[in-house]
Design a protein with these regions (language model features):
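Short, well-structured active-site flanking segments
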Residues: 1-14, 58, 113-116
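Extracytoplasmic
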Residues: 2-4, 65, 70, 89, ...
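Active-site-proximal beta-strand/loop segments in catalytic clefts of secreted hydrolases
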Residues: 11-12, 40-43, 51-55, 77-78, ...
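Short linear capping/connector segments at secondary-structure termini
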Residues: 12, 78-85, 139-140, 214
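Conserved catalytic neighborhood of penicillin-recognizing serine enzymes
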Residues: 14-50, 58
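Mid-domain, small-residue-enriched loop/turn segments at the edges of structured enzyme/sensor domains
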Residues: 28, 36, 49-103, 107
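Structured C-terminal helix/loop/strand segments within mature extracytoplasmic catalytic/sensor domains
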Residues: 54, 58, 101-131, 140-142, ...
Length: 221
């Protein structure tokens, strides 16, 4: 398949939660690149499941992860033999080391081929979710990022193309006592604090700070 391949949306694919594709009208035209973009930038559940089906279910994705040497990164949803893991962990599971390593390999043009690595990396630099870790980084610094969130777990992967050199990290929480979805959720406050600390560590001469009122603009106080 090519990114430009045309597809037709069917409302039978609706999956609630995050994302805008669930609101498409029946029969709406789309394409593979739009699905990939929505999956990455908007964490679109409907688009993600459609893509998972197109590539050959979660079992195929897990085979790719195995070939990439990722022992712990797996899709549990709609994947043969993963039901117990799905009941325990949900859609998928990973580790900070494997997820960060995967993004670094993408940055270094080592996934699939250089052109594919670049295309994937570009998508990751256009996330919709800027009010978490990215709110503590200058908007003029490119960041490849992906967020994940369910009630009791919040995660965020970043590779920051900082002026004095790239740095990458992954932060994830589990069994959260605070399962709220407001701007001041404890896990998101932690993610912001980590982002702020790492920026100060790697760019100690930077005088950039979030602008007054930025929190209110993003839905905070």
């Amino acid at each position: 398949m090519a990114l430009t391949d045309s597809l037709t949306y069917d409302t039978a694919r609706v999956y609630g939660g995050s994302g805008v594709m669930q609101y498409y009208r029946d029969g709406a035209p789309t394409d593979l690149r739009t699905l990939a973009s929505l999956m990455i930038t908007d964490s679109d559940n409907t688009a993600s499941l459609w893509l998972q089906e197109l590539v050959g279910t979660g079992s195929y994705v897990n085979g790719v992860m195995e070939r990439l040497g990722l022992r712990h990164t797996r899709v549990n949803s709609r994947a043969e033999g993963r039901r117990a893991d799905w009941e325990r962990y949900g859609w998928g599971q990973t580790t900070p080391r494997e997820m960060t390593g995967l993004l670094v390999r993408m940055r270094n043009r080592e996934l699939v081929d250089p052109a594919s690595s670049d295309a994937m990396y570009r998508l990751l630099t256009h996330t919709y979710f800027t009010k978490y870790s990215l709110s503590e980084l200058p908007p003029y610094v490119q960041v490849a990022a992906k967020q994940g969130m369910v009630n009791a777990s919040r995660s965020e992967l970043l590779l920051v193309n900082a002026p004095h050199g790239d740095y990458a990290y992954f932060i994830a929480t589990k069994n959260n006592a605070d399962t709220s979805w407001g701007y001041d959720n404890a896990a998101w406050v932690l993610q912001q604090a980590v982002a702020r600390y790492l920026w100060a560590y790697f760019e100690p001469r930077s005088d950039w700070r979030p602008a007054p009122g930025a929190g209110r603009l993003l839905g905070g106080e």
